[in-house]
């Protein structure tokens, strides 16, 4: 049995929705145990509420538990072309895992969201840098998801990983095409994890 963690941060719910789609895809794979968790919120509760943050039900992960999984699929919104501060703070606490090589050889993949499209690919590839320092095997999705070829509408999605475009005010929710790409990413990573660890 391969253990897959979908680990995310979501302020307004876009990445949370994508995380559930990623997990749904991963659960299609026989031999995959899939768990969804989120990183801790670093914003004071009153500021989070004032900013319109969405309360989420996923359990909160600890950095140390990352070593328990065969694959980790990270989801983060874009903040100026980088991962969110909450995800960065969480990953900055993995120094002990790095020192012991606890994540070496584990699969790592990334999905993201952005307001208007700018920075979505940069967010994924800049997150890969942290995964590389841990010795993780980075898993992009390539162009196997057919939705990536659809240019008839505005949508997220890259060969690096699934993405969604939230709109400048956050009112746009992930489209069916974006969720389909996210499901593909989950299924693809879980399939590889089962092959390697099953």
UniProtKB/Swiss-Prot annotation:
InterPro entries, per database record: Flavodoxin/NO_synth, Flavoprotein-like_sf, Flavoprotein_WrbA-like, FMN_Rdtase-like_dom, NQO
Keywords (A to Z) from UniProt: Flavoprotein, FMN, NAD, NADP, Nucleotide-binding, Oxidoreductase
Positions annotated to bind NAD(+): 12
Binding residues annotated for FMN, in chain numbering: 10-15, 78-80, 113-118, 133
All residue ranges annotated as the Flavodoxin-like domain in the record: 4-189
Cofactor mode of binding and number, as noted: Binds 1 FMN per monomer.
Catalyzed chemical reaction(s): a quinone + NADH + H(+) = a quinol + NAD(+); a quinone + NADPH + H(+) = a quinol + NADP(+)
Residues reported in the UniProt entry to bind substrate: 98
Family annotation (PROSITE patterns): FLAVODOXIN_LIKE
The keyword Nucleotide-binding belongs to this UniProt entry's keyword annotation: yes
Named cofactor requirement(s): FMN
GO cellular component: membrane
Molecular functions per Gene Ontology: flavin adenine dinucleotide binding; FMN binding; NAD binding; NADH:ubiquinone reductase (non-electrogenic) activity; NADP binding; NADPH dehydrogenase (quinone) activity
KW Cytoplasm (keyword) present: no
EC number: 1.6.5.2
A Pfam short name: FMN_red
Family classification: Belongs to the WrbA family.
Protein name: NAD(P)H dehydrogenase (quinone)
UniProt organism field: Salmonella arizonae (strain ATCC BAA-731 / CDC346-86 / RSK2980)
């Amino acid at each position: 049995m391969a253990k897959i963690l979908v680990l995310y941060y979501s302020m307004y719910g876009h990445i949370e929705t994508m995380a559930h789609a990623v997990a749904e895809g991963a659960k299609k794979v026989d031999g995959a145990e899939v768990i969804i968790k989120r990183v801790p919120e670093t914003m004071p509760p009153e500021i989070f509420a004032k900013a319109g943050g969405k309360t989420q039900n996923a359990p909160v992960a600890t950095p140390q538990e990352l070593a328990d999984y065969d694959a980790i699929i990270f989801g983060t919104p874009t903040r100026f072309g980088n991962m969110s501060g909450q995800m960065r703070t969480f990953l900055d606490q993995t120094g002990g895992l790095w020192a012991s090589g606890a994540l070496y050889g584990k699969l790592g993949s990334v999905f993201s969201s952005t307001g208007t499209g700018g920075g979505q690919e940069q967010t994924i590839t800049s997150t890969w840098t942290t995964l590389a320092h841990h010795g993780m095997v980075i898993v992009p999705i390539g162009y196997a998801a057919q939705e990536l070829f659809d240019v008839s509408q505005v949508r997220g999605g890259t060969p690096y990983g699934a993405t969604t475009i939230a709109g400048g005010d956050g009112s746009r929710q992930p489209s069916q095409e974006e969720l389909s790409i996210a499901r593909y990413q989950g299924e693809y990573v879980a399939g590889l994890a089962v092959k390697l660890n099953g």
